[in-house]
């Protein structure tokens, strides 16, 4: 049985302390814990609670060159991660990011009609989908989510 994500959970997973904090620079700038699949240091976590539901972070991607930030989570069901109900979350653009991609974004988009984050986002989703341990049941995010299939 596939876990059903609520709109509220997906909305909260798309917020700063969650998906954006997969980028260590953002998390430090905002005073949040760094969201990572393998926390090794103080100030790092692999658990997100949204609308009372616990989620385990299984993968993150923060690409400095394009500003893409994303994560993949599994809901905790009966005390265990449900790897057959993975949600992949893509962050929107962080206007406070030191990555300045305005000019390069415009050039790439003009020539390809694609966001420069598209290839990074697409590759991230494919990595999760190609892992036999996981089944992606939900994609969520802002502008990049519409491009990922």
Residue ranges and their predicted role:
Residues 24, 30, 36-143, 147:
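A conserved cap/lid and substrate-binding interface adjacent to the catalytic center
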Residues 1-32:
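N-terminal low-complexity, Ser/Thr- and acidic-residue-enriched intrinsically disordered segments
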């Amino acid at each position: 049985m596939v876990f059903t994500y609520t709109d509220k959970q997906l909305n909260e997973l798309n917020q700063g302390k969650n998906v954006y904090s997969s980028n260590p620079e953002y998390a430090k700038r905002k005073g949040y814990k760094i969201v990572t699949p393998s926390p090794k240091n103080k100030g790092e976590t692999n658990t997100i609670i949204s609308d009372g539901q616990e989620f385990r972070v299984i993968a993150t991607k923060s690409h400095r060159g394009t500003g893409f930030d994303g994560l993949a989570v599994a809901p905790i069901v009966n005390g265990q991660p449900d790897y057959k109900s993975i949600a992949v979350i893509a962050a929107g653009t962080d206007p406070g990011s030191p990555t300045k991609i305005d000019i390069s974004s415009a050039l790439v988009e003009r020539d390809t009609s694609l966001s420069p984050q598209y290839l990074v986002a697409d590759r991230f989703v494919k990595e999760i989908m190609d892992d036999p341990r996981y089944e992606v049941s939900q994609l969520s995010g802002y502008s990049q989510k519409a491009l990922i299939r």
